[in-house]
């Protein structure tokens, strides 16, 4: 089973972000998307620490220590980009002004519930950040995650067992094996990578999947 690399996943998500979109890239894996957005598309990247017009990762030696994203990673600012207060940034997030946010996840349920801030372990450090605000405020919520954990457990589940970030908020999931939409009738597989069959994907996924072509012809 050949999986996409982290950068290949970021490239795949970048292809689906439309011209003119206002997008927040969550901490961790989603920040890689900034490096693969096509130069001929005008896309506005937002960071909750107070940036709009964020660009890709700077080249080695060109880092500005005062220009970072919410994950404390060095970023660049595109022409026309701006800075603003943290409170204003969260008003943008909560007010429905972002078209898309891309978040990581520990689990996503078949109905689109999101769990991405705690595993519930007694020694876990709660770190919800702005994820709850994004989950309810963005018009579309995309999730980037590995299909399986290191222990081989699928992250797409019937019901989340970890503390929830948002209920029914996820629109689409990008894993290292497939692209899956969350619909009213359940998860719909839009794309499978590297020759994996639908049957093989279903075998490792503990929720009922529908293949997009079958769903559209029904």
Each language-model region and where it sits:
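Conserved phosphate- and dinucleotide-binding cores of soluble alpha/beta proteins
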Residues: 4-8, 59-218
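N-terminal active-site beta-alpha-beta segment that forms phosphate/nucleotide-binding
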Residues: 1-78
């Amino acid at each position: 089973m050949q999986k996409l690399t982290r950068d290949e996943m970021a490239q795949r998500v970048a292809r689906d972000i439309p011209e003119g979109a206002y997008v927040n890239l969550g901490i961790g894996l989603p920040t890689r998307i900034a490096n693969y957005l096509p130069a001929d598309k005008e896309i506005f990247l937002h960071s909750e620490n107070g940036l709009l017009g964020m660009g890709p990762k700077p080249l080695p030696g060109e880092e500005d220590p005062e220009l970072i994203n919410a994950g404390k990673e060095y970023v660049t600012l595109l022409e026309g980009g701006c800075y603003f207060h943290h409170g204003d940034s969260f008003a943008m997030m909560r007010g429905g002004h972002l078209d898309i946010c891309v978040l990581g996840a520990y689990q996503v349920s078949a109905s689109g519930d999101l769990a991405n801030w705690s595993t519930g372990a007694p020694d876990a450090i709660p770190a919800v950040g702005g994820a709850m605000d994004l989950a309810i405020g963005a018009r579309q919520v995309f999730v980037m995650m590995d299909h399986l954990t290191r222990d081989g457990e699928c992250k797409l589940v019937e019901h989340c067992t970890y503390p929830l970030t948002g209920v029914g908020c996820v629109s689409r999931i990008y894993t290292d094996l497939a692209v899956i939409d969350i619909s009213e009738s359940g998860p719909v597989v839009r794309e499978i990578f590297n020759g994996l069959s639908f049957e093989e994907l279903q075998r490792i996924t503990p929720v009922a999947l529908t293949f997009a072509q079958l769903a559209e012809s029904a």
